[in-house]
Amino acid sequence: MKREDVLMEALPYIQKFHGRSMVIKLGGHAMVDTCIMDTVIRDVVLLQLVGIKCVIVHGGGPEITEKMKAMGKQPRFVSGLRITDDDTLEVAQMVLVGKINSKIVSLVSRAGGRAVGISGNDANLIIARKMDRQKVRVENREEEVDLGHVGEIEEIRPALLHTLLDNQFIPVISPLAIDRNGNDLNINADTAAGELAIALGAHKLISMTDVDGIMNRERTEVYRRMTPQDAEELIASGVVSEGMIPKVLAVLRALHGGVPYAHIINGNLAHNLIMELFTAEGVGTMITDRIDEV
């Protein structure tokens, strides 16, 4: 496709999305590859420059695990959730806020944008409660495990985000929360992104991962568009499995909460974010029950 054709195809999408908000969840290999991350951030800054209000939510699980191992501490998980004792919470805060968040903010500035790095516990942005003990099977018997400082989101207070967005800043949010007694909690980044999208009334939730989207059973083709019901059936039938399940569930929660469109795309390929949003074919999976709009 010629360069002028790309620009002309993008124009109606730019016009349609102008002034609308989008929550972009960054995860996967892009989080540890600065070159890939730099490309993604440049795309986000471009979105802002054409009038789209962007919120970035980032993960950091692999980096937390790496830091813990370097400190001689073995990570532990139950049902995909990290057991977060006092030391683990301290490491998570160090990695998420001190390393990843600050790096993203710097990349936004380098690309010509303006970002503000915050955590979910800043300004009581994300209120959560300590997650209930989880039941697991150990040697043919059921046990309950305390996950420690792991939170389940109860409330989003988006006033700070609206202020930042209205003043042309890009909020960059670490997946931490605070309970009603002022205690810090670790939360799932996919879940946080979905709940923030609902609270903001976002037009789109975009999950950037290490895969091209939701694949068919044979793993030979990416579904370009599907309804929430289609996605639920793929989970029930086992086509969507393992690490994709929590990502798709977070997307479905956002859609059921009023977000019109959700996308799952590969964040490791240059300019996939732009191609997904500004071309008719896209590059990943769009989930929506809308028919005509984008």
UniProtKB/Swiss-Prot annotation:
Binding positions for substrate? 60-61, 82, 186
**Which HAMAP family does the entry mention?**
ArgB (MF_00082)
Q: What does this protein do?
A: Catalyzes the ATP-dependent phosphorylation of N-acetyl-L-glutamate.
Q: What is its EC number?
A: 2.7.2.8
> What keywords are annotated for this sequence in UniProt?
Amino-acid biosynthesis, Arginine biosynthesis, ATP-binding, Cytoplasm, Kinase, Nucleotide-binding, Transferase
| GO annotation terms (biological process) | arginine biosynthetic process via ornithine; L-arginine biosynthetic process
What does UniProt give as the signal peptide span? none
Places the protein is found: Cytoplasm
Q: Name one Pfam family in it.
A: AA_kinase
**Does the keyword section mention Ligase?**
no
The UniProt catalytic activity note for this protein reads: N-acetyl-L-glutamate + ATP = N-acetyl-L-glutamyl 5-phosphate + ADP
Which residues does the UniProt site feature Transition state stabilizer point to?
25, 247
State the family named in the UniProt similarity comment for this chain.
Answer: Belongs to the acetylglutamate kinase family. ArgB subfamily.
User: Which pathway is it part of?
Assistant: Amino-acid biosynthesis; L-arginine biosynthesis; N(2)-acetyl-L-ornithine from L-glutamate: step 2/4
* One Gene Ontology molecular-function label: acetylglutamate kinase activity
Q: Which GO terms describe its cellular component?
A: cytoplasm
- The protein in question is named Acetylglutamate kinase
Keyword DNA-binding listed? The answer is no
**Main subcellular localization, coarse class?**
cytoplasm
What organism, scientifically named, is this protein from? Methanospirillum hungatei JF-1 (strain ATCC 27890 / DSM 864 / NBRC 100397 / JF-1)
- This protein's source sits in the domain of life called Archaea
